[in-house]
Structure formats: structure tokens, C-alpha cells
Amino acid sequence: MQTRLEQLMQKLPASIDCAIITSDVNRRYFTGMRSSAGTVLAFRDAAYLIIDFRYIEKARACVKDCQVMEQSNLYQQITALLEQHQAKRMAVEAETMTIQAFASLKQQVGNLVELDCSDVLSDAISHCRRIKSEQELQKMRAAQQLAETALEQVLQWLHPGVTERDIQLKLDFAMLQLGAEDLSFPTIALTGTKTSMPHGVPEESVVVQPGSFVLMDFGAVVDGYHSDMTRTVCVGSPTETMRQVYNVVL
């Protein structure tokens, strides 16, 4: 079975000899390792993860599809690999690489390879990632199930007198306690007239009143895969107007 990096290189034009991946999410997708730093260099016949001393032990233990190299002088290491594989054209992540990072890369290796900063690499990565394996689907389902379980816990607790901030923290804690590695995004919890704001900010000063709406927008991360759900509930008995509005939005 092909590795993800082998699949990626197959999707790139034949004129591309290698690809450099530096964004956190794509690095994790292709190596299976979560880190805040590291560089993946993929060639037609090999792939490398260059990573600093903070992550080297973990990388050597869990990364299977790349040769792991401890970072010393990053650009010297990249140069050596480009020369070793006789690469002439390298694709970069145009959507995520900063201008400063691109300028530094070009200054260091521009005499060896032509840097392709078109959308060719980003498009190939998107194509790889949009087709989910059964294992990926299971992780997505697990993230959603975790969020739903957290919501059930919060609904059992929810009552008049708590603040929007209380609800936010309760949801966050429930998801993390259930095993989420992170939150999909900052949790939104709003009540009363603020529920008309899709992306409002929870406030400590806003208190849930009897018979009021509470809107919650939240999600959990499981093994790098995110869930995202929005739910609106009524704390107490809704008025007929509230029922009509709720059903219209539904």
C-alpha cells in the first residue's frame, strides 16, 4: 500500500522533483505526528522529516513513512538532500508559506532548484485529503460522538442563573475530560437576544434567564480530526413565538 507521501508525489506533475511541507496540519497528515515545528521533504523515491531536538525522540518512535533527521542547520540539510536526489524543481505550500519563509528558502536553495509557488502542491494536497479512508471516517465519527456526549452532560447541568462563560467552560472541560486532544475552535455559548449572533463571544456578565434560548457552537478534536456542531435549546418552556422562530431556522 502506498504511503500518503507517495500518493502525493504521484499527483504532482512529472516536472516536480520534490515537495516541501511546513504547515502544522499537513505535516501531521503526512507523517502522523503532531508537532509545532518540522519540515517534510518528499522526493519521488524517498521522504524525510527534519525536526528539532524537542521532538526527535517522539518522531523516531512514531514516524514510519519518512526518514527522521534531527535538525542542525536546516538549510544545509535541505541543500544536501536536494543535491543527493538531483532535484531541479521543488513545489512549496503556496497557501500557507509566509513571504519571509519563501524568501529565506529561495535565498538558500534558489541556486539549486526552481521553486514552484503556484497552487500545484496545495491542489495535490487538497485532493489527497478530501478522499477519506475508513480509518479517517472513524476518527471523524469519534470526534462527533465525543462532542455529543459532552453536550448531553452539559444539558443535564444547564439551568437559569449560569453565565455564558460558565456554559463555555463546562463544554470545554467535558470534551477534554472525555478525551479530546483539543477543541476544534473557541467554544461559543450565547443566550437570550445574543443567540442571533452566529459567532458571538460568551460573556461572564450575561446570565441565562428562565425560558430563554441558549445557543452552543463547539467541536472536539480526536487524533487530528475535528467535529463541529451547533445546537440551540430552551432553558424552561419556550413561548409560541420562540417555537415558531426555532422551527423556521430549523
What are these model-derived regions, one by one?
Residues 1-250:
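Active-site neighborhoods and metal-handling regions in enzymes and metal-associated proteins
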